Amino acid sequence: MSGGVKLIAGLGNPGDQYARTRHNVGAWFLETLAQQRNQSLAKENKFHGFVAKCNDYWLLKPTTFMNESGQAVAALARFYKIKPSEILIAHDELDFPAGDIRLKEGGGHGGHNGLRNIIQHLGSSDFYRLRIGINHPGHKDRVTPYVLSPPSENDRIAILAAIEKGLRLIPELVQGDFQKVMRELHS
């Protein structure tokens, strides 16, 4: 993959009942980024989400449910001719402790339905993922209620700190300095 990020999407489910849940930490990331950049996210039905143009890149918060996120990402990417390798998806990651944040280049969906749908709609898995740790409930049967509930206060604080760490590296992501981002996040 080459070039910098031209589209940053933050995954989550729409509606107030999901806004503070673990599954929405990608949306938390995107909303915080928009606030820091003084950008207002405007609803764009043709992109199935809230959108803002921020210098040389787009911000996208899908209005679809998580498992249909690919509609929004693919619609905006195709309209603006953004390649999968120029896309960054911020999402919740069960396999990392709350407070961990890592950048991944390409790969599978790892059981994440939002990523699965994005891969399906883009026809490619060659996009970047900003994986924000939320902990694992311990057993697969508890995953759905776990991700659809708010984190504990300690986990919420750790998740917000991870988001801040990721936000500080947006300039490097936009410039395409992915190795520097990985060094910063993974050390």
Swiss-Prot record:
It comes from Coxiella burnetii (strain Dugway 5J108-111). This is Peptidyl-tRNA hydrolase. Keywords: Cytoplasm, Hydrolase, RNA-binding, tRNA-binding. It is found in: Cytoplasm. The lineage of its organism: Bacteria, Pseudomonadati, Pseudomonadota, Gammaproteobacteria, Legionellales. One of its GO terms (biological process) is protein quality control for misfolded or incompletely synthesized proteins. GO terms for molecular function: peptidyl-tRNA hydrolase activity; tRNA binding. Signal peptide: none annotated. Belongs to the PTH family.
